[in-house]
């Protein structure tokens, strides 16, 4: 569980000990996946400049692929034959480019959410 106050206390201790200005240390937030937006914002306010999100991004990709499977399940059981007819082809449904695209769309959505959470949208 993320406890951002530890970051603030660390900044304060370093500032007092070494006579620096405010927020003398830039922090990297390892293991940020699954953190609440309010905790992320608090951590940023205490000097976090980088946050690792790999687990959230992996899950987002999988969730997109899994959602595609659930939606198209009846078209993914055989090469030919689906609810539209026993002789109807399913190639366009099991083509990896199709279901991988669902994963890509899902991960893009999650990345946008992460950028918003991290106050990193439209920053050059």
Locations of regions flagged by a protein language model:
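Alpha-helix-loop-beta-strand connector modules within alpha/beta enzyme cores
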Residues: 1-27
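Hydrophobic faces of well-ordered beta-strands that scaffold small-molecule active sites
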Residues: 25-31, 49-53
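Alpha-helical scaffolding segments of alpha/beta enzyme cores, especially the outer helices
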Residues: 5-12, 42, 109, 113-116
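Glycine-rich beta-alpha junction loops
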Residues: 31-35, 55-58
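Glycine-rich phosphate-binding active-site loops on the catalytic face of alpha/beta enzymes
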Residues: 46-64
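Extended, intrinsically disordered, low-complexity segments
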Residues: 70-124
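Active-site-adjacent beta->alpha loops and helix N-cap segments on the catalytic face
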Residues: 1-11, 36-40, 59-69
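Catalytic cores of alpha/beta
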Residues: 32-47
């Amino acid at each position: 569980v993320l406890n951002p106050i530890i970051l603030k206390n660390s900044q304060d201790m370093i500032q007092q000990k070494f006579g620096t200005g405010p927020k003398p240390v830039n922090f990297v937030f390892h293991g940020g996946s699954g953190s609440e937006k309010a905790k992320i914002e608090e951590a940023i306010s205490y000097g976090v400049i980088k946050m690792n999100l790999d687990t959230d991004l992996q899950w987002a990709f999988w969730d997109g692929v899994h959602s595609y499977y659930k939606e198209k399940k009846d078209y993914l059981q055989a090469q030919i034959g689906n609810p539209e007819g026993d002789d109807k082809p399913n190639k366009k449904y099991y083509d990896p480019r199709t279901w991988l695209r669902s994963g890509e769309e899902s991960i893009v959505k999650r990345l946008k959410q992460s950028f918003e959470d991290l106050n990193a949208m439209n920053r050059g």
